[in-house]
């Protein structure tokens, strides 16, 4: 990236940030967790700034301060949602720690000793609110995180809010980039201090903040070797194995070299998270409930003419495909690692 985004940050994003946050200090440094690695700022720009368009075109992150993408949803809070979101089921994760490490339940059979660190249940929205309020009243370590794709069970007012999103702007972005279809809008409601550990997605993402503030730390695809993802067949595929709170440098020595790109997003901000970029997301400490909606798009189709050398994200895709093919050919995901070690040791390292 990194030069381009860093240059933009140095040349003007600070002014945009001051302007966007002029009403008052919405958060302070005491609400951010401390980590061992350095970070650089992600640019904060107007959607009309040509530099913002350049960053998105180059698949580099940027915070857009004035898209009005989810303007009708800025009034959303727990009370409004409880009254209007309908009687569908919502996926709610509970954990005894602040970290919500994603896992794919369909892959749990590949690793018999795997134990998820959070539990998922399907409940009504009012049940989620009741559980949340009970936890807040009694205190303790238990935490909740609602993660649900918006679907046709929502009530009329939510539908009207959804139709009022700035689809004109985001559809133009989709068209200009040649992206595939919008695959989902994921609603995220988290407790203060919740953390989604570093992971990457295989889709383009406009991350729209609605309520509260979230800290977002991103890492480009070329830092793959610093972040040590789980194997493709593991339930935590695409997630980093490194515990950011207490890194094990003996197991993960390259983590010493990692450098993040950081921002804090508040209501109305939209963060572009490029496909294959790692992202670590945390609701600020003592910041109250956070509400976010993701806009996930399939990436652009592979060009007919491949340009060399390949980009970092293309190499990540190749590595994923190799792991998948070996798992299928061997008939046992547990044999993939030993075979790769046999291929590489003493020959390529």
Curated annotation (Swiss-Prot):
Q: Where is this region: Interaction with VHL?
A: 2-125
Q: Cite the JmjC domain residue spans from the record.
A: 142-307
- Residue numbers spanned by region Disordered: 1-51
Leader sequence range is none
- Where do the TM regions start and end? none
Q: What does this protein do?
A: Hydroxylates HIF-1 alpha at 'Asn-799' in the C-terminal transactivation domain (CAD). Functions as an oxygen sensor and, under normoxic conditions, the hydroxylation prevents interaction of HIF-1 with transcriptional coactivators including Cbp/p300-interacting transactivator. Involved in transcriptional repression through interaction with HIF1A, VHL and histone deacetylases. Hydroxylates specific Asn residues within ankyrin repeat domains (ARD) of NFKB1, NFKBIA, NOTCH1, ASB4, PPP1R12A and several other ARD-containing proteins.
Write down what this protein is called.
Answer: Hypoxia-inducible factor 1-alpha inhibitor
Task: Give the species.
Answer: Mus musculus (Mouse)
The gene behind this protein is Hif1an
């Amino acid at each position: 990236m990194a030069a381009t985004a860093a240059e933009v940050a140095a040349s003007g994003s600070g002014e945009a940030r001051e302007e966007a946050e002029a009403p008052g200090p919405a958060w302070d440094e005491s609400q951010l967790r401390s980590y061992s690695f350095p970070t650089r700022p992600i640019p904060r720009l107007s959607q009309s700034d040509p530099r913002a368009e350049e960053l998105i075109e180059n698949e580099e992150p940027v915070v857009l301060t004035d898209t009005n993408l989810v303007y009708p949803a800025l009034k959303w809070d727990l009370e409004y949602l409880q009254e209007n979101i309908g009687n569908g089921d919502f996926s709610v994760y509970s954990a005894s720690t602040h970290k919500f490490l994603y896992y794919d339940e369909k892959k749990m059979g590949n690793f018999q000793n795997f134990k998820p660190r959070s539990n998922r249940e399907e409940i009504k929205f009012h049940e989620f609110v009741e559980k949340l309020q009970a936890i807040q009243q009694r205190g303790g370590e238990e935490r909740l995180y609602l993660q649900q794709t918006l679907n046709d069970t929502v009530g009329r007012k939510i539908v009207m809010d959804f139709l009022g999103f700035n689809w004109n702007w985001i559809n133009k972005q989709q068209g200009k980039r040649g992206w595939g279809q919008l695959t989902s809008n994921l609603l995220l409601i988290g407790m203060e201090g919740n953390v989604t550990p570093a992971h990457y997605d295989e889709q383009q993402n406009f991350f729209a903040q609605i309520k509260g503030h979230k800290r977002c730390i991103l890492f480009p695809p070329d830092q793959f070797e610093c972040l040590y993802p789980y194997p493709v067949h593991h339930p935590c595929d695409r997630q980093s194995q490194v515990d950011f709170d207490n890194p094990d440098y003996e197991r993960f020595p390259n983590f010493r070299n990692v450098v993040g790109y950081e921002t804090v997003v508040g209501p109305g901000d939209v963060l572009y998270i490029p496909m294959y970029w790692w992202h670590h997301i945390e609701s600020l400490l003592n910041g109250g409930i956070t509400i976010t909606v993701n806009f996930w798009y399939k990436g652009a189709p592979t060009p007919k003419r491949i340009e060399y050398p390949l980009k970092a994200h293309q190499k990540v895709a190749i590595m994923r495909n190799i792991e998948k093919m070996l798992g299928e050919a061997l008939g046992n995901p547990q044999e993939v690692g030993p075979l790769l070690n046999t291929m590489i040791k003493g020959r390529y390292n």
